[in-house]
Regions:
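Membrane-embedded hydrophobic alpha-helical segments
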Residues: 1-31
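Long, hydrophobic alpha-helical segments that serve as membrane-spanning/inserting helices
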Residues: 23, 27-232
């Protein structure tokens, strides 16, 4: 009877030991997963900082291109009477300015593919991250349209301007072209420039909106990270 009772007690002891060990293992695993999630979110926040710098540059570049086209459209009737270096600069900005947005989606994909995204408590963070990277593909398509428009216009620029020096502006674009044309900008070229301006403006507005959303996303990520008791 005593032996039977001892066996039962030992079995119960082993069960308790196993249960506690299993609980601690699961808890440690859960803590580890939470740590990985937070590391990914921190990296995404750092990527956001880099993206914000790139997008602010892009917004300035596309604003400059749009303003150059507006100037050419407004002054085309009097183009031959204006300073050749000014006209050449505006044509160069109108035709050549384009951007290529390069983002880093590695952390987002890792968070998504590992299932760690399910550990994010704030649903707003999940939705904001997903919407951000979806929108990037759209921006790249707009940029491709602008590059293609510029490629179509380059023959006119090369035929009617000459690069006198290789000085760059504050954004890194050439500002040394001088107008050598003998006529105002032909209407087909002017109309294509107007189309290009519309795309620049559309892109610039989308980027400004993305800048606001990325700043808000950084704040949301900060709130999510503050929920981790290990960080408080």
């Amino acid at each position: 009877m005593f032996t039977h009772r001892l066996d039962v007690q030992l079995s119960y002891y082993h069960f308790r030991t196993f249960s506690i060990s299993f609980y601690l293992e699961r808890k440690n695993d859960s803590d580890y997963q939470e740590e990985l999630k937070n590391q990914s979110l921190n990296r995404i926040s750092n990527n956001l900082t880099m993206d914000l710098g790139d997008m602010e540059f892009n917004a300035k570049a596309h604003t400059k291109a749009s303003e150059a086209i507006a100037w050419l459209v407004k002054n085309n009737h009097n183009l031959l009477n204006l300073p050749k270096d000014t006209v050449g600069l505006k044509i160069s900005q109108a035709v050549s300015i384009a951007t290529i947005f390069v983002d880093n989606q590695e952390e987002y994909r890792a968070l998504q593919n590992s299932g760690l995204i399910e550990l994010i408590e704030l649903e707003e963070v999940v939705l904001a991250i997903q919407n951000k990277y979806k929108s990037h593909d759209f921006y790249k398509k707009i940029e491709d349209m602008i590059v293609n428009q510029g490629s179509e216009l380059r023959p006119y620029m090369y035929q009617n301007t000459q690069l006198k020096h290789e000085q760059l502006d504050e954004l890194g674009f050439h500002e040394g072209r001088v107008f050598t044309g003998t006529e105002p900008i032909p209407n087909p070229i002017l109309e294509r420039l107007k189309d290009k301006k519309w795309i620049h403006d559309f892109y610039q507005n989308r980027i400004q909106d993305r800048i606001k959303k990325d700043r808000a996303l950084q704040e949301l990520i900060h709130k999510e990270l503050q929920k981790d008791p290990h960080l408080n």
